[in-house]
UniProtKB/Swiss-Prot annotation:
Signal peptide: none annotated. Belongs to the universal ribosomal protein uL4 family. This is Large ribosomal subunit protein uL4. InterPro entries: Ribosomal_uL4, Ribosomal_uL4-like, Ribosomal_uL4_dom_sf. Gene3D superfamilies: 3.40.1370.10. The gene is rplD. Keywords: Ribonucleoprotein, Ribosomal protein, RNA-binding, rRNA-binding. Residues 55-75 are annotated as: Disordered. GO terms for biological process: translation. One of the primary rRNA binding proteins, this protein initially binds near the 5'-end of the 23S rRNA. It is important during the early stages of 50S assembly. It makes multiple contacts with different domains of the 23S rRNA in the assembled 50S subunit and ribosome.
């Protein structure tokens, strides 16, 4: 267990929180992390590609010429693959690219991504945002005060409409919940801001 500083949104120290090293301070497993990122990127693919095979191309119902006696090669339809305008052989069809990973591997990947951010000093814990109403300007001031880079992942314990609406119009800022935290979002962001309650919730699930 290690202690981490908890900051207020004005940048001052609010206190500290003790978090499990098994979640936030492991040696990142790069191969599992790579596999988890590939899994998520594959799941994002639409897979709607399609071409027409010989049965789907319009026309070609009549035999082009008789079977024997012409001296030419026998043909059954002008929509066969060797004809111009014919169907495609073994072309792409709609499919899902999603596949599964064991739960232990998925959790190891998340722990690795979190530990990587902590090791990079790209992990900031705040006590709470405390927005009473959506204020984009105030949220930008918070990011400036906490010296955050352009690509930031903000993690709250539960859905916080005021935080989501405040950050929605700021390029490079993404808001998610502790339950929705995933490897692709973590690795895509340059920095992570997480509330103390969200950090405890993540620890509870992954420990």
């Amino acid at each position: 267990m290690a202690n981490y500083d908890v900051l207020k949104v004005d940048g001052s120290k609010s206190g500290s929180v003790e978090l499990n090293d098994a979640v936030f301070a492991i040696e990142p497993n790069n191969s599992v992390l790579f596999e988890a990122i590939n899994l998520q990127r594959a799941s994002l693919r639409q897979g709607t590609h399609a071409v027409k095979n010989r049965s789907a191309v319009r026309g070609g119902g009549r035999k082009p010429w008789r079977q024997k006696g012409t001296g030419r090669a026998r043909q059954g339809t002008i929509r066969a693959p060797q004809w111009r305008g014919g169907g495609v052989v073994f072309g792409p069809t709609p499919r899902s690219y999603a596949y599964k990973m064991p739960k232990k591997m998925r959790r190891l990947a998340l722990r690795s991504a979190l530990s990587f951010k902590v090791q990079e000093n790209s992990f900031t814990i705040v006590d709470t945002f405390g927005f009473e109403a959506p204020k984009t300007k105030e949220f930008k001031n918070v990011l400036t005060t906490l010296e955050q880079p352009k690509k930031v992942l903000v993690v709250t314990e539960n859905e916080d409409v005021n935080v989501e609406l405040s950050a929605r119009n700021i390029p490079g800022v993404q808001v998610t919940t502790a339950q929705g935290l995933n490897v692709l979002d973590l690795t895509s962001a340059d920095s992570v801001i997480i509330t103390e309650a969200a950090a405890k919730k993540v620890e509870e699930v992954l420990a």
